[in-house]
């Protein structure tokens, strides 16, 4: 019996030595470097792709709307009509990116607040430009609502639903929950 208690205590001591006793996670240098790079990437995206006077982003950089031909579109009519703004799919990536930065800075009130402000004042107002209420069910279209009707891809909408759900879970703000519910009816 004494040997089993001794062995158990030895095992417990070894486990504590291996795992350590700290309960709070210290930020790793690599995590901070990745956060800095992520912020620089997002800042660069907005510096080079922002469409002046809007919350929208350009489709390409440098932006040459008159001389640009999209070779990946299905029809000649689409190919020869330049888009002033990006499609929903690349634009919605900013929502996911800002959500990731909100999550990464949850322990830093200032940075967390700055990213949430960016989401509320730039990303979501731009995203609203893609919200199609002309057809039912209401959903996000592949291109802005002021243009001729465009396709609505339900996988794009599901990703937006996930992003709204994620930001609600991080902030507990009701407006994000209401937006998320649109996708999960």
Specify the residue positions occupied by each region the protein language model found.
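Functionally constrained cores in energy, signaling, and assembly domains
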Residues: 16-17, 94-95, 99, 151, ...
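Mobile, glycine-rich extracellular loop/lid and propeptide segments
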Residues: 151-164, 179, 183
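Bacterial Sec-dependent N-terminal signal peptides
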Residues: 1-29
């Amino acid at each position: 019996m004494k040997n089993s208690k001794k062995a158990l205590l030895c095992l417990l001591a070894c486990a504590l030595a291996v795992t350590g006793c700290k309960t709070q996670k210290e930020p790793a240098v690599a995590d901070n470097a990745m956060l800095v790079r992520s912020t620089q990437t997002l800042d660069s995206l907005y510096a080079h792709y922002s469409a002046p006077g809007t919350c929208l982003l350009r489709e390409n950089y440098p932006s040459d709307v008159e001389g640009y031909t999209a070779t990946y579109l299905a029809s000649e009519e689409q190919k020869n009509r330049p888009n002033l703004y990006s499609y929903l799919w690349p634009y919605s990536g900013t929502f996911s990116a800002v959500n990731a930065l909100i999550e990464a800075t949850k322990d830093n009130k200032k940075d967390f607040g700055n990213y949430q402000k960016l989401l509320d004042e730039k990303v979501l107002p731009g995203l609203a430009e893609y919200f199609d209420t002309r057809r039912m069910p209401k959903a996000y279209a592949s291109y802005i609502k002021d243009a001729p009707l465009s396709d609505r891809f339900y996988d794009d909408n599901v990703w937006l639903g996930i992003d709204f759900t994620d930001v609600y879970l991080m902030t507990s703000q009701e407006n994000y929950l209401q937006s998320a519910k649109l996708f999960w009816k």
